[in-house]
């Protein structure tokens, strides 16, 4: 438990240090009503933050592991880019990490790559602690059932509780740790004007 909180705190600090934030954020409604049908969002829309806390118990079926992770996501002002940072600890022989579409307790298809940035898988042998992946997801990066669709379609799945991040390893090729993506605890959407 203590290790999970430390990893989460470090991940939040790392992500926040790399993000431009307005000096005095204004709390907005936690909704996607401002997201337009063309995949962008209106000029007065909020900057949105999401988080997934990953553990073996959330995998389907559950995996017994000491590995933990945190994925932090931030939507840009026009809703066309979703920046992310994926941090993990105590995990061995990583092969890949993704965003999948499915509710908690159900496995679903890959819709975006987090590590590496695309196929094929890349093995990191041995134990890994630190930032596994960071980058930006756009509509062009969506794969599987979201290929050719907009980032808004991914955000709709997040809003409905139907998106998760997970990390795959050689010993658990279906996924060793997983976490549903949701609005971040303690993080609020902020006005970007």
Name every feature range the model reports, one short phrase each.
Residues 2-9:
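Sec-dependent signal peptide recognition
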């Amino acid at each position: 438990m203590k290790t999970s909180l430390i990893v989460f705190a470090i991940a939040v600090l790392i992500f926040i240090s790399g993000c431009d934030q307005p000096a005095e954020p204004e709390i907005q409604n936690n909704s996607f009503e401002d997201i337009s049908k063309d995949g962008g969002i209106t000029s007065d829309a909020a900057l949105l933050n999401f988080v997934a806390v990953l553990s073996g118990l959330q995998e389907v079926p559950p995996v017994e592991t000491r590995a933990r992770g945190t994925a932090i996501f931030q939507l840009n002002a026009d809703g066309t880019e979703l920046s992310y940072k994926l941090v993990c600890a105590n995990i061995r022989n990583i092969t890949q990490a993704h965003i999948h579409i499915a509710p908690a307790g159900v496995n679903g298809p890959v819709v975006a790559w987090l590590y590496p940035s695309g196929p094929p898988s890349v093995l990191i042998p041995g134990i890994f602690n630190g930032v596994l992946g960071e980058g930006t997801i756009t509509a062009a990066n969506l794969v599987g059932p979201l290929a050719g669709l907009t980032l808004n379609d991914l955000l709709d799945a997040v809003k409905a509780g139907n998106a998760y991040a997970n990390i795959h390893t050689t010993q658990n090729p279906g996924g060793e740790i997983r976490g549903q993506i949701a609005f971040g605890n303690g993080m609020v959407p902020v006005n970007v004007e």
